[in-house]
Amino acid sequence: TIMMAGPMIICEGANVRHSAFLRGNVIIGAGAVVGNSCELKNALIFDEAQIPHFNYVGDSVLGYKAHMGAGAVTSNVKSDKSLVVVHAEDKDVATGFKKFGAILGDGVEVGCNQELL
């Protein structure tokens, strides 16, 4: 059984597996895999990205063929609840968000049980 709540686009050829929980604004690209017991919230998942098992991806972007190892998660709230600032190239950019997970580029590999802050 898959739980889906909220607006989403699941492209042709995407594979959403048993016990996945999709909520908020979610886009899953063609050929992407969202595995068993994974939760996605406000996530943009590009084509052929893999979130295969026991992952949480919130308020995040995963690039083409990015891969999250088993149990890897994105932390999307700062412990002090302040607004998130992203370092981009040579400057800091204020996002205006209290919640912002991770941006993974194309082909990025995240090891098992890693927490991306």
Locations of regions flagged by a protein language model:
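Structural signal for interior beta-strand "rungs" in well-ordered beta-sheet cores
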Residues: 1-117
